[in-house]
Structure formats: C-alpha cells, structure tokens
C-alpha cells in the first residue's frame, strides 16, 4: 500500500501529497465484510404477514358422527367446508407473521473490523480491479481530492474532474452495464439494474450530490459510511474517492 498519495485539485491537477492514515494498513477480514453485509441487508427487510382472521371469516358447524360424511366444519344448511387448511379459501396452516423477528445482529467488534477492512481494501489496486472497476494503470489508490470539489454545482464540471484524474472509464463501464432486471421487479419501479461505480466520501454528502447524477456513483459522509456502500454485495474493494477532510477524519479512527 502507498504511504503517500497525491492530492488532486478541482481541475484534476496534482496539488501536493498527503500521508495516509494507519487504517489503510488494517488487516483485511473478507469473511467479516460478508457477514456484516448480510446482517445489514437482512435487517432492512420489511415485515409482512397475513391477517390473523384470514380464512376464519365464515362460521362453520361440525357435524355429529353417523351421518355418512366427514366431520369437518361446514356452512349451516350446506356442505361447503370452511375454516381449515385443507378447505378452499380456508385458513393457511403456517402463514407468515408480521411479528417474526427479521433483525440479524452482529457483534460490535466484528462490525467495526468489517468496516475497517472495507476501508483498507479501497487502497488495494488489486482488490479494486478484481471487483471489476476500471481506472488508469498509473493512478495510486486511494484517490484523494481537495475539499473544494464540494463546491462543484454542474455535472459537466464533475465529469471533467473525473476524466482528468483517470476515473471516468469506470463511469462508462457502469453506463454500458445498465440492463433490464430479470423477474417481477421490472414491474415494481425497479426496471433497471445499474452496476456500482465510484464512491465519493466527504464530510458532508449533501455538498457532493452533483456526483450522484452519474451512473453507479454513490456519495457518503464519514458518519453515514457503511458496509453497503463500501462493499456492495459483500465484496470489498470499491473504487473510492476521499476528500482531504475525510482522510483527516479517518486518521482519528481507532483502528
């Protein structure tokens, strides 16, 4: 891993160098990254369940023995069976319940180790390329830009910055990889899937929102940085751009 990386200005030119914090030398635990991603993803599920009265809204009377028919609850004056699992429109035997525990926990130490591992993998060129990202061969990772990029208001300026640094190729990869989703999701306002490209990390994600209009780009503040953004799908090594302030905040992290 590089101990020093260049700082790029708002014009994409090298403005100086910065010492990387020790967190980028953290011992990577890919198993914990997968575990943390799974726990977070499963905990975001929406509770669902059937009504407790489903299949029980008809009054059925059980017949006495000796009538030559099975003793199942039937509608009065008729032969239709109601209220049991084997009947048409009857109660489901084991229906889903909204009270089911969906939250999946993870140890606090493991969660921190997973986050530190994912951050460390953003500085590994091999891990980033293995994940499928495309960038300039001579570009040292992680990419650090000056805080002035938070003042960019036009997408055109953001594109010019990424082109001059050597990161725009990954945006094109995401744009070309956009495809129609398989399955029912295409009918439910999730028609397209777009591959993940850059992650822009700063101290304030609102000021970096101009980058969100680019295909596959996510922005995050240091407070909102999570495994879901650092390692989509539980696979670390996302191509990440940090601001100077974000690097200084990482320096304070207790790795």
Swiss-Prot record:
Disulfide partners: none
PROSITE patterns in the record: RIBOSOMAL_L1E (PS00939)
GO biological process, one term: translation
Keyword hit for Metal-binding: no
Molecular-function GO terms, alphabetical: rRNA binding; structural constituent of ribosome
Name of one Pfam family that matches: Ribosomal_L4
Coiled coil: none
GO cellular component: ribonucleoprotein complex; ribosome
InterPro entries reported in the protein's UniProt record: Ribosomal_uL4, Ribosomal_uL4_dom_sf, Ribosomal_uL4_euk/arc_CS, Ribosomal_uL4_euk/arch, Ribosomall_uL4-arc
Keywords: Ribonucleoprotein, Ribosomal protein, RNA-binding, rRNA-binding
Ribonucleoprotein found in the keyword field: yes
Function statement: One of the primary rRNA binding proteins, this protein initially binds near the 5'-end of the 23S rRNA. It is important during the early stages of 50S assembly. It makes multiple contacts with different domains of the 23S rRNA in the assembled 50S subunit and ribosome.
Self-association and partners: Part of the 50S ribosomal subunit.
HAMAP family reported in the protein's UniProt record: Ribosomal_uL4_A
Similarity remark: Belongs to the universal ribosomal protein uL4 family.
Official protein name in the record: Large ribosomal subunit protein uL4
Native source species: Thermoplasma volcanium (strain ATCC 51530 / DSM 4299 / JCM 9571 / NBRC 15438 / GSS1)
Upper lineage: Archaea, Methanobacteriati, Thermoplasmatota, Thermoplasmata, Thermoplasmatales
